[in-house]
Amino acid sequence: MEKYHGLEKIGEGTYGVVYKAQNNYGETFALKKIRLEKEDEGIPSTAIREISILKELKHSNIVKLYDVIHTKKRLILVFEHLDQDLKKLLDVCDGGLESVTAKSFLLQLLSGIAYCHEHRVLHRDLKPQNLLINREGELKIADFGLARAFGIPVRKYTHEVVTLWYRAPDILMGSKKYSTPIDIWSVGCIFAEMVNGRPLFPGVSETDQLMRIFRILGTPNSANWPSVTELPKYDPDFIVYEPLPWETFLKGLDDTGIDLLSKMLRLDPNQRITAKEALQHAYFKESS
């Protein structure tokens, strides 16, 4: 820690306190002091292993992990620092982002996700708060892989991995299969929020979250999602909703944008588009 000074607390993240600090050359960093669930046990070796993988991730749309400082009792991750996040930006942009900005952010988000998925690293907790933005309009994804390294704190169940509003229906119904589609669902929710200026599914509980999804996208059944009936929390007595036309709840998104979003927000995870496929979509070929 001697290398860093001028510590200024800038927030409390999912995993602990975040500080802004400078090194001896005047460069600014974000220091994430990881909160350990069991203080007396020290840092789990699995966490160290996962973090060492994150140091290898090098992509312009992923927040760079520069350094890992670990003593017996604590772990500090040293990341590059960015001043703004997407949530703060959306809070001040009434009615959503301009279409050219939303498209640029989505393209960068998918580029970072595709890179990590190719390296077999999932995010599992994507939300506007951990998409950081700099003054040049560059977007970088923060907290990649931390869900796997440390688990999502305070929750006792491994399937509770994504902040409620961005959580995929398969996870909400108890699926333990963590794979790349859970991140794609979150990306779709973020895309819709950038366009609309408000969350698409702002649920207050897991059940409410599912019902909000079904009210818009329709209630799944074995015809449109063959394995849905096998999920632990599937209920044959779910209220049956018909899907709404996309135009009714998405303002200002053209047909190709709606087509891309509809491929991300498929109820059945096996039918969701991959990040790599999404990058080739016609939505990115047209000029806004």
From Swiss-Prot:
EC assignment: 2.7.11.22, 2.7.11.23
Function statement: Serine/threonine-protein kinase. Involved in the control of the cell cycle. Required for entry into S-phase and mitosis. Probable component of the kinase complex that phosphorylates the repetitive C-terminus of RNA polymerase II.
UniProt cross-references to Gene3D superfamilies, sorted A to Z: Phosphorylase Kinase, domain 1 (3.30.200.20), Transferase(Phosphotransferase) domain 1 (1.10.510.10)
GO biological process terms, semicolon-separated: cell division
Active-site residues, as the UniProt record annotates them: 125 (proton acceptor)
Entries under SUPFAM superfamilies matching the protein: Protein kinase-like (PK-like)
Keywords on record: ATP-binding, Cell cycle, Cell division, Cytoplasm, Kinase, Magnesium, Metal-binding, Mitosis, Nucleotide-binding, Phosphoprotein, Serine/threonine-protein kinase, Transferase
UniProt-annotated binding residues for ATP: 10-18, 32
Modified residues (Phosphothreonine): 14, 158
Record comment: activity regulation: Phosphorylation at Thr-14 or Tyr-15 inactivates the enzyme, while phosphorylation at Thr-158 activates it.
GO MF term list: ATP binding; cyclin-dependent protein serine/threonine kinase activity; metal ion binding; protein serine kinase activity; RNA polymerase II CTD heptapeptide repeat kinase activity
Top-level taxon in the UniProt lineage: Eukaryota
Organism: Plasmodium knowlesi (strain H)
Keyword Glycosyltransferase: no
Family: Belongs to the protein kinase superfamily. CMGC Ser/Thr protein kinase family. CDC2/CDKX subfamily.
One GO cellular component term: nucleus
Complexes and interactors: May form a complex composed of at least the catalytic subunit CRK2 and a cyclin.
UniProt xrefs under InterPro entries: CDK (IPR050108), Kinase-like_dom_sf (IPR011009), Prot_kinase_dom (IPR000719), Protein_kinase_ATP_BS (IPR017441), Ser/Thr_kinase_AS (IPR008271)
Reactions the enzyme catalyzes: L-seryl-[protein] + ATP = O-phospho-L-seryl-[protein] + ADP + H(+); L-threonyl-[protein] + ATP = O-phospho-L-threonyl-[protein] + ADP + H(+); [DNA-directed RNA polymerase] + ATP = phospho-[DNA-directed RNA polymerase] + ADP + H(+)
Segments forming domain Protein kinase: 4-284
The name this protein goes by in its record: Cyclin-dependent kinase 2 homolog
UniProt keyword annotation of Transmembrane present: no
Needed cofactors: Mg(2+)
Cell compartments where the protein resides: Cytoplasm
